[in-house]
Amino acid sequence: MASKEKKLGRVVVVMGGTSAEREVSLMSGSGVLKALRDARVDAEVFDPQVQDIEELVSKDYDRAFLILHGKGGEDGVIQGLMEYIKLPYTGSGVFASAISIDKVMTKKVWESIGIPVPRGTTVTADSNMAEIIRLLGKNLIVKPSKEGSSIGLYRINDATPESLSEA
C-alpha cells in the first residue's frame, strides 16, 4: 500500500488571505497543516497576503487544501485560479462558491427550489427603514450580504428607522 505522502503528493494549504476573516483562516490553516504533517503528508503553506501568486502557480503541487475564508477565499476567486492552473482543490467549485458567498443570491436559489428560508429583505441606504420594520417586526438581525461568519452582524431589539440605518 502506498504511503499517504506518495498517495496525496505535495499539498499546498492555502490560508490567511486578505479578508476580514484572515485570523480565523490562519488558525484553521495551522490546524490543517499540523494534521497533514502529523499524517506524514508533504504539505506547505501559501498565504496570498504575503506571497505572490506566481509562487503558487510555479510550484509543482499535486493538490490544494483551501482554508481561506470570506472575500477571495469563499467567493469563487481562488477556486477559479485552481481550475485555471488545473490544481485539484478541496471545497465547493467556482459557481457554488460565487453563489453561496452572496446571501441574497443564495436565498433566491434556495427559495426557487422550495427550501424554506426566513423572512427578510435587502436593506440599502436608500431603503424605507420604517416600512422594513413594519414588514419584519422590531426584532431584527442585520448582516452584510457578502461577509462570512458573524462579521458585521447586528442584532436589533425594538428597532427604529435610525437604529436600522446605523446597522
Positions of PLM-derived features:
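ATP-binding N-terminal substructure of ATP-dependent carboxylate-amine bond-forming enzymes
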Residues: 1-95, 99-108, 112, 122-132
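Solvent-exposed alpha-helices and their adjacent loops that cap or buttress functional pockets
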Residues: 4-5, 132-135, 144-148
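A general structural motif
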Residues: 8, 137-139
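Glycine-rich phosphate-binding loop of ATP-grasp-fold ATP-dependent ligases
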Residues: 25, 118-120, 139-167
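Short secondary-structure junctions
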Residues: 114-116
